[in-house]
């Protein structure tokens, strides 16, 4: 069953993303599913949700879930503006993290910059982008009660 989940997720993302982007989106998706205790189909519903979830983002967020996506986008902007990460890195870099479940509750811990090997390239960006994704996924979990099914695949032209 896990193999099927990986295939479905990868194929769903492949139409709109490069190979690096797929890996990064896959990592973010795994965080979203773990922290939110969601299955793969529920996790995929965030892509294209509201005005900010998925590719692009504009206008005013429509609810707290959409605000999580706006904050995630802003974190990626800080990665380029303040951390010196390349724009492509925010979507294409892969990073290291650990996840654990205690009493059915998932926790995610991103590898710190100092914990990467000295031979690792762009470790500051890897650590920062992982934190962006972890915080975004935690926001989705915290705001899951605001998730509005009518905002799935929302037309961005309305934003």
Swiss-Prot record:
It comes from the Eukaryota. The active site is at 72, 133. Disulfide bonds join 51-159, 53-69, 68-139, 75-132, 85-125, 110-130. InterPro entries: PLipase_A2, PLipase_A2_dom, PLipase_A2_dom_sf, PLipase_A2_His_AS. Keywords: Calcium, Cytolysis, Disulfide bond, Hemolysis, Hemorrhagic toxin, Hemostasis impairing toxin, Hydrolase, Lipid degradation, Lipid metabolism, Metal-binding, Secreted, Signal, Toxin. Ca(2+) binds at residues 52, 54, 56, 73. Expressed by the venom gland. Residues 1-19 form the signal peptide. Binds 1 Ca(2+) ion per subunit. Pfam families: Phospholip_A2_1. Residues 20-23 form a propeptide. It catalyses: a 1,2-diacyl-sn-glycero-3-phosphocholine + H2O = a 1-acyl-sn-glycero-3-phosphocholine + a fatty acid + H(+). It is found in: Secreted. One of its GO terms (cellular component) is extracellular region. Belongs to the phospholipase A2 family. Group I subfamily. This is Phospholipase A2 AP-PLA2-I. It comes from Acanthaster planci.
């Amino acid at each position: 069953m896990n193999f099927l989940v990986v295939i479905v997720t990868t194929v769903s993302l492949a139409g709109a993303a490069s190979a690096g982007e797929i890996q990064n989106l896959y990592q973010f998706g795994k965080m979203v599913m773990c922290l939110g205790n969601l299955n793969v189909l529920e996790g995929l519903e965030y892509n294209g949700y509201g005005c900010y979830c998925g590719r692009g983002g504009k206008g005013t967020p429509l609810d707290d879930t959409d605000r999580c996506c706006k904050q995630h986008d802003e974190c990626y902007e800080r990665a380029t503006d303040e951390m010196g990460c390349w724009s492509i890195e925010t979507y294409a870099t892969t990073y290291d993290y650990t996840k654990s479940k205690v009493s059915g509750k998932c926790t995610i811990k991103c590898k710190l910059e100092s914990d990467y090997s000295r031979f690792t390239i762009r470790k500051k960006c890897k650590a920062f982008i992982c934190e962006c994704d972890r915080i975004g996924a935690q926001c989705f979990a915290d705001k899951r009660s605001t998730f509005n099914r009518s905002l799935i695949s929302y037309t961005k032209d309305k934003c």
